[in-house]
């Protein structure tokens, strides 16, 4: 290399040093000063990892005095370059010696980097191109946002999430029966709204007891990092912002907290949200004359927030007025009058009955035919297909079909059987004595509920006298029984749930010390990470725990359907909690009958509660939609019976009779009131199954796995294969970046297999929607990784020394989240020969790539320097060809956008004529969006993203 004092060079290995200046040439050594950092580097002249900086005619260059010039001529004198041209600010002619170039010049354009010798590995060029292709495909994919959740592919959930998640500012009521996954549906909708850019700020309002469950569900299932806001958090956040709720984008808050703290509620109102989610919305009490404070708060928020999701118990359970109150929150203009709503419901009831006949395939009665004809013009009942089309139209025109989704177990397949096993046991003398002493000492006070709860858990009474020691496990017959059950079913996974964390801890110790049974605990005193580890240990097939012992609160939000044995060591006083316990195993996807084991102590409140649940409500072997209203109706009598703790059979029998008299007619009424039309609409039918099939095919796509592993390799992320479809990722010592997006410093265990992720809470499910994959692609495309490369092509059919230039352009418009589904950044690949002909369409990337051999940076730089004028010319010709191709891409995007949005607009306008639930704001939004996207698509620009220079060789 001919070095001369004053020349400008750039380091190949330390590009952040900026431009270097040769300050000494002595013997075999050369010294460069890098003025931007003040550092010196001494190199051996023959092997110096530096590249000469030279610019070409037409380039714009910056000077050390912060003005720029356009180069018109390049001269050389005594080994130094002189750039002749004009200043860009005043058109003054100038001649600039290279020593006066800016010290901070960076080569961001791929052609500048190529000519400056900043040549990357060929494998990184390939990775960059694949990142562009995959990003483009993913943003066009209509299922984007659905595949990324750690959820089973359940048709009705996917359909609701897809249907609602694609709307602008969705305002809907999710009213699926318990166990059908309303929380998952809401999570998928939130995930899609955030990924598509339709929403940025989300507020979830919940009862305090559900906050942690939602926090875990959103994080573990959807990688959404919500923040819990209470008074302490608000005080902390006040240091960063006047309104603490503006310090986070995703917030979970207790409705009760806001009700008690008026100032905090005012701050929540002042913060701007895109989506409001309210769980347990049926607890928002409302009457025409006296709405509750909680209802008024949600109403005030719903008036300001564009999107609203209300999660509620099934409408039928709570009466029409309560149902109307929630619909009124979603659209007060549409649901303005309760009496009018009742009249409309009654009229719709006749339509639903007629639709029932249509669905059953029977000959339509005259009344049904007349009703359907009034709803559907040109009614054709000639065959099954015509009937199905008629049903589809009715679904679209359904009275509340756009705002209400409700599925029941009766119309959803895939749930397991439930079988109850009961084990009566004698009350130990130690408990009898403890109860007697408690009574003598006046410890039997408190309200009815407190006394009832006390007798349900006699071990707690005993421990009041014993202290910290848990010797109750030595004489309680339920412990011996549990040991025998576990020993007799060594190969079975068993989930044990009890009310208190202390009970779970004591049981685990007893099982371990007495019989060496492998178990683990799971309770609210553990961190999320500790719970993940416990869950993973339980899920592990070889060498894992046989039994997982959960507390009531600790088990919230977790599902263990790989187990089929459930032990209810004690019973909760609330029927909703009982269903929640059973729901840990009774999920869609459970392969076996759920065996429910209930031990109880005879002659105690435990026996009475077990019989009330089973003989009164049949709540163990069936889901019980009537449980809540029946429980409220007999609450005081039940509590009195339990608080007496006498085993009074006469009183118990009377209570069971009353319970059944309430339960059975209500259950029959709910069944008769089922809205088949609404259920078919909510379940999605064939459309839902198509979604499942599409997502299952995406799960089986090995291309994503291949790309991910290649990306981790190139960036420098360590990968350790742990078997069982598991891979441990940790930051490498020599990564291209200081940290990889979404990868903690202590690493992460990932899997690409959905069933594995569903059974292992300690593993992340990697998909195209996962933050690590999206962040990794953004990292590559937002940097210069792989932007330049040089390779050799061994091909004796071509003249030796022939050159090819591979140009990767990207056609993109201004960033707009709604634009991506029509015009995402689109790669355009050209393969130019020396004559400027584009061979890209004839020579596929993958096949061509396999024929190439990489070269090192120094040889690559020499090859580029020798062909620099030719490369300049080919880039110019390629730009012209790419512009022509871009025009075609823009035309297709414009047509696709216009057709899609016009179809949506036409459908909604037609629907509005027969269904008032279509909001004017939706129509206005689509019209405005159409005009805005049309303008943005027309503004699409072309940029050169990557270059690969190829030289033909015969060796």
Swiss-Prot record:
A motif (DEAH box) lies at residues 279-282. Residues 478-642 form the Helicase C-terminal domain. ATP binds at residues 176-183. Keywords: Activator, ATP-binding, DNA-binding, Helicase, Hydrolase, Nucleotide-binding, Transcription, Transcription regulation. GO terms for molecular function: ATP binding; DNA binding; helicase activity; hydrolase activity, acting on acid anhydrides. Residues 163-333 form the Helicase ATP-binding domain. It comes from the Bacteria. One of its GO terms (biological process) is regulation of DNA-templated transcription. It holds the Pfam family Tudor_1_RapA. The keyword Transcription regulation applies. Its EC number is 3.6.4.-. Disulfide bonds: none annotated. Interacts with the RNAP. Has a higher affinity for the core RNAP than for the holoenzyme. Its ATPase activity is stimulated by binding to RNAP. PANTHER family: DNA ANNEALING HELICASE AND ENDONUCLEASE ZRANB3 FAMILY MEMBER, SWI_SNF-RELATED MATRIX-ASSOCIATED ACTIN-DEPENDENT REGULATOR OF CHROMATIN SUBFAMILY A-LIKE PROTEIN 1. HAMAP family: Helicase_RapA. Belongs to the SNF2/RAD54 helicase family. RapA subfamily. Transcription regulator that activates transcription by stimulating RNA polymerase (RNAP) recycling in case of stress conditions such as supercoiled DNA or high salt concentrations. Probably acts by releasing the RNAP, when it is trapped or immobilized on tightly supercoiled DNA. Does not activate transcription on linear DNA. Probably not involved in DNA repair. This is RNA polymerase-associated protein RapA. It comes from Aeromonas salmonicida (strain A449).
């Amino acid at each position: 290399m001919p070095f001369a004092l004053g020349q400008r060079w750039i380091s190949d290995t330390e590009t952040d040093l900026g431009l270097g200046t040769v300050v000494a040439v002595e013997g075999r050594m050369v010294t460069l000063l890098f003025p931007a950092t003040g550092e010196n580097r001494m190199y051996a002249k023959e092997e110096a990892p530096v590249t000469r900086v030279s610019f070409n005619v037409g380039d714009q260059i910056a000077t050390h005095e912060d003005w720029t010039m356009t180069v018109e001529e390049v001269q050389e004198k005594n080994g130094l370059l002189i750039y002749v041209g004009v200043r860009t600010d005043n058109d003054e002619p100038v001649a600039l010696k290279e020593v006066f170039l800016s010290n901070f010049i960076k080569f961001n354009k791929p052609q500048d980097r190529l000519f400056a010798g900043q040549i990357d590995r060929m494998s990184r060029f390939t990775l960059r191109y694949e990142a562009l292709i995959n990003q483009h495909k993913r943003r066009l994919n209509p299922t984007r946002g659905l595949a990324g959740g750690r959820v089973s592919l359940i048709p009705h959930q996917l359909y609701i999430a897809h249907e609602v998640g694609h709307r602008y500012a969705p305002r809907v009521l999710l009213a699926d029966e318990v166990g059908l996954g309303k929380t998952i549906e809401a999570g998928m909708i939130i995930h899609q709204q955030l990924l598509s850019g339709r929403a940025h700020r989300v507020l979830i309002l919940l009862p305090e007891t559900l906050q942690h469950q939602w926090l875990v569900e959103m994080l573990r299932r959807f990688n959404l990092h919500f923040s819990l806001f209470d008074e302490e958090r608000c005080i902390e956040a006040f240091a960063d912002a006047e309104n603490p709720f503006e310090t986070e984008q995703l917030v979970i808050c207790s409705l009760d907290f806001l009700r008690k703290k008026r100032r905090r509620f005012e701050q929540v109102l002042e913060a701007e949200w895109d989506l409001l989610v309210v769980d347990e919305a049926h607890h928002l009490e409302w009457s025409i004359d006296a709405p509750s404070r909680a209802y008024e708060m949600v109403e005030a928020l719903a008036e300001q927030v564009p999107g609203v999701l209300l999660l509620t118990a099934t409408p039928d359970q709570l009466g029409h007025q309560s149902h109307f109150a929630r619909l009124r929150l979603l659209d007060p203009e549409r649901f303005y009058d309760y009496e009018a709503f009742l009249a409309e419901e009654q009229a719709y009831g006749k339509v639903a009955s007629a639709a029932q006949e249509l669905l059953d395939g029977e000959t339509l009665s005259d009344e049904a035919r007349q009703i359907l004809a009034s709803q559907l013009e040109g009614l054709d009942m000639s065959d099954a297909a015509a009937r199905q089309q008629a049903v589809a139209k009715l679904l679209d025109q359904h009275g509340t079909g756009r705002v209400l989704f409700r599925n029941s177990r009766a119309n959803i397949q895939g749930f397991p059987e439930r079988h109850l096993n009961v084990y009566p046991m004698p009350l130990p003398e130690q408990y009898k004595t403890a109860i007697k002493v408690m009574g003598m000492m006046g410890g039997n006070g408190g309200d009815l509920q407190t006394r009832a709860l006390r007798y349900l858990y006699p071990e707690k009474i005993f421990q009041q006298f014993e202290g910290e020691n848990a010797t109750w496990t030595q004489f309680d017959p339920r412990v011996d029984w549990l040991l025998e059950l576990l020993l007799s079913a060594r190969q079975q996974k068993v989930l044990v749930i009890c009310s208190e964390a202390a009970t779970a801890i004591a049981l685990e110790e007893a099982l371990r010390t007495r019989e060496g049974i492998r178990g683990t605990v799971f309770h609210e005193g553990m961190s999320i990470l500790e719970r993940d580890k416990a869950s993973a240990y339980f899920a592990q097939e070889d060498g894992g725990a046989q039994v997982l012992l959960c507390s009531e609160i600790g088990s919230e939000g977790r599902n263990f359907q790989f187990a089929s044995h459930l032990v209810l060591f004690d019973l909760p006083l609330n029927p909703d909690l009982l269903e929640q316990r059973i729901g840990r195993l009774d999920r869609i996807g459970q392969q076996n009958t759920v065996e429910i084991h209930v031990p109880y102590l005879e002659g105690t409140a435990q026996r009475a509660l077990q019989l009330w649940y089973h003989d009164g409500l049949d709540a163990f072997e069936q889901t019980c939609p009537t449980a809540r209203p029946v429980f409220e109706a007999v609450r005081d009598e039940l509590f009195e019976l339990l608080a007496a703790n006498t085993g009074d059979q006469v009183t118990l029998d009377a209570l069971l009779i009353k319970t059944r008299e309430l339960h059975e007619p209500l259950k029959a009424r709910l069944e008769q009131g089922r809205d088949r039309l609404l259920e078919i609409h909510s379940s999605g039918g064939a459309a839902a199954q198509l979604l499942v099939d599409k997502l299952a095919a995406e799960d089986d796509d090995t291309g994503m796995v291949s790309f991910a592993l290649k990306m981790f390799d190139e960036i420098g992320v360590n990968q350790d294969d742990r078997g069982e479809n598991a891979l441990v990722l940790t930051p490498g010592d020599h990564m291209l970046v200081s940290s990889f997006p979404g990868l903690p410093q202590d690493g992460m265990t990932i899997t690409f297999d959905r069933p594995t992720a569903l059974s292992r809470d300690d593993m992340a499910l990697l998909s195209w929607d996962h933050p690590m994959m999206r962040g990794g692609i953004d990292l590559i495309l937002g940097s210069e990784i792989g932007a330049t490369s040089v390779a050799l092509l061994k091909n004796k059919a071509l003249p030796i020394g022939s050159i090819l230039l591979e140009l990767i352009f990207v056609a993109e418009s201004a960033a707009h989240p709604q634009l991506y589904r029509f015009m995402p950044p689109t790669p355009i690949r050209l393969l130019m020969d020396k004559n400027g002909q584009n061979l890209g369409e004839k020579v596929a990337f993958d096949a061509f790539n396999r024929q190439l051999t990489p070269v090192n940076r120094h040889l690559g730089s020499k090859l580029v320097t020798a062909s620099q004028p030719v490369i300049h010319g080919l880039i110019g010709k390629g730009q012209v060809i790419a512009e022509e191709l871009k025009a075609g891409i823009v035309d297709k995007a414009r047509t696709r956008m216009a057709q899609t949005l016009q179809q949506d607009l036409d459908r909604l306008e037609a629907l509005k004529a027969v269904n008032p639930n279509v909001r004017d704001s939706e129509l206005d939004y689509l019209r405005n969006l159409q005009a805005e996207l049309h303008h943005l698509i027309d503004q699409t620009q072309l940029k050169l993203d990557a270059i690969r220079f190829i030289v033909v060789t015969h060796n």
